[in-house]
Amino acid sequence: MLSLNTQKTIDNLHNVFTKKNIPPIRIGDNVKVGVRIIEGNKERVQFYEGTVIAKKNSSINTTLTVRKVLQGIGVERIFLIHSPKVDSIEVLRSSKVRRSKLYYLRNLKGKASRLKQQFR
């Protein structure tokens, strides 16, 4: 069991490092994630666009798994939402899904992997 003082310190750290400007993201959304990349002494933002196939909610360790198909090859990346490397997250389109994890999209190709759009 953690002491009360230790728990307060952990809560303060969570409050300091959590981002406040994150839009509500659901499974099946098409998102555009801006990732900060440092090359030498230059810093730039590279955007990664794809479908959210999984989300793990764990306070400051919340992650998104985003999948896109690039030149016929499926590419998945896992992003820590509250990481300083993640610059921005923008929801481009919402889809109607009835699963919490969309791992079955890995086996679908072409038009079969499309999701039905939902207007919010």
Curated annotation (Swiss-Prot):
Q: Which GO terms describe its biological process?
A: translation
**Which Pfam families does the record cross-reference, listed alphabetically?**
Ribosomal_L19
Q: Name one GO cellular component term.
A: chloroplast
Look up the domain of life of the source: Eukaryota
Q: Which GO terms describe its molecular function?
A: structural constituent of ribosome
Localization annotation: Plastid, Chloroplast
Q: Keywords for this entry? A: Chloroplast, Plastid, Ribonucleoprotein, Ribosomal protein
Please give the NCBIfam families that the UniProt record associates with this protein.
rplS_bact
Q: Which family does it belong to?
A: Belongs to the bacterial ribosomal protein bL19 family.
Q: What is this protein called?
A: Large ribosomal subunit protein bL19c
Which species does the entry assign this protein to? Trieres chinensis
Its gene? rpl19
